[in-house]
Amino acid sequence: AAQFDADIIILADLARWEAQQRQRRHEIANLGADNHTAQAGELYKRSYFVDWRVCDRWKQDLLPVLDYLLDTNEPGVPRLISGDTLLDALQHTSARPFRVVPFFDPGLWGGHWMEEICGLDRDAPNHAWCFDCVPEENSLLLGFGDQTVEIPSNDLVLLEPVALLGDAVHARFGPEFPIRFDLLDTMGGGNLSLQVHPVTEYIQAHFGLHYTQDESYYILDAETDIFKQGNLLGSGLASALTLENLPEFGHSVA
């Protein structure tokens, strides 16, 4: 593309989980800003709704024509591969089963089930969720001989959307992976948060997103007497909900 007219094009890439860790340590700022001292949550929100989307639009044109990709995830240990090598690796990945690199994070409702099942650090206060198969936030490890290169897994979505998603899904959502897979752990922790997602028209007008979030839950494990203790799984809110009848809806069970 004309905007990338240069003798050599090198993309310095960074996994988004690593970017979040650097934001939490106040080492990096948002795109075009001098705000590295801001709250980590504010840095993340701006990254999610602005920075990543702006950069992904550039990446769509940049990835097919770059000469080299530079993995910058490990400070002081940069790893360089050619653009052709990257394209071949992602084309190969899109045609076979693969998985992304999961990450785990504490939270308000966090429990300790994943510590037992996944062998996680028991010194952490809790583990509220595991992000696994969320390409816009997880990363992908590519092996080249005895070297491993880490890239945002969303690079694969941007470069091979049809091969990865299929024609019908790509026609509806474009180069975006429209499903997020999370593990939520409340065992030994607290109640999940109340989530409110806007309708499609609102989220498109105010956040620039083309679809809203619908959710489906699978219970993988539970205490044997969970329902005897009166613990219920709420089925969500209904259009007829008002402040007056909220207690009534609060007792619905999925």
Language-model features: locations:
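Small-molecule kinase domains that catalyze NTP-dependent phosphoryl transfer to phosphate-bearing small molecules
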Residues: 25-87
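Short, flexible, glycine/charge-rich loop motifs used to bind or transfer phosphoryl groups or to couple energy/partner
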Residues: 2, 58-59, 207
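ATP-dependent NMP and nucleoside kinases share a basic, alpha-helical "lid"
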Residues: 1-32
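A glycine-rich, Thr/Ser-enriched phosphate-binding loop motif common to dinucleotide/cofactor-binding enzymes
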Residues: 250
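Transition-metal
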Residues: 66-244
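Loop-centered beta-sheet repeat module
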Residues: 253-254
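Active-site neighborhood of divalent metal-dependent phosphoester bond hydrolases
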Residues: 247
